[in-house]
Amino acid sequence: MDKSESTSAGRNRRRRPRRGSRSASSSADANFRVLSQQLSRLNKTLAAGRPTINHPTFVGSERCRPGYTFTSITLKPPKIDRGSYYGKRLLLPDSVTEYDKKLVSRIQIRVNPLPKFDSTVWVTVRKVLASSDLSVAAISAMFADGASPVLVYQYAASGVQANNKLLYDLSAMRADIGDMRKYAILVYSKDDALETDELVLHVDIEHQRIPTSGVLPV
């Protein structure tokens, strides 16, 4: 081998990447793939819990159960004195109650504070007798008997408490739209007086689909 061939061979050897560099590159690629997979799984998990245009308040569900839709009611409790109570029956629009035999599968309450809210409230849904006047004494007894789950909502510096929803499954009870007048939303203002501009309750009633008019209103 002459000198030029020896020099060329030396150059070729020098051009080869070092084994350590190749290993570091492969390791970085593998780490990137693992991170990408983790981010993909995280995005899927978060997407499953996001509201959607089809079902904006049943968080965690992209759509109603097959054959079902939902009707929303918004309640703003009036001023409630400290240690006192408020109750409101579930009154659906006439266009819905017309189909009173359609089954109801779920009721969800979502508690949203308004800017002035800095209190603690207890919220629940209860089936009440038609004769009940939802007096303070009657509501107090229903909160005390432990027969229904209660959402304790407190002031959160971030604006909205993470667990601000209650979901009731009525499918096993075969409840229907006509039964909804027998249910009431109950609120207990535990520590402070609740002002009229402090709290909003969004109530979603998931029920079997009802016929809709094919003619636009004029």
Curated annotation (Swiss-Prot):
Pfam families reported in the protein's UniProt record: Cucumo_coat
SUPFAM superfamilies according to UniProt: Positive stranded ssRNA viruses (SSF88633)
Region described as Disordered: 1-30
CC annotations in GO: ribonucleoprotein complex; T=3 icosahedral viral capsid; viral nucleocapsid
Positions of modified residues (N-acetylmethionine): 1
UniProt similarity note: Belongs to the cucumovirus capsid protein family.
Identification of the protein by name: Capsid protein
Provenance organism: Cucumber mosaic virus (strain P6) (CMV)
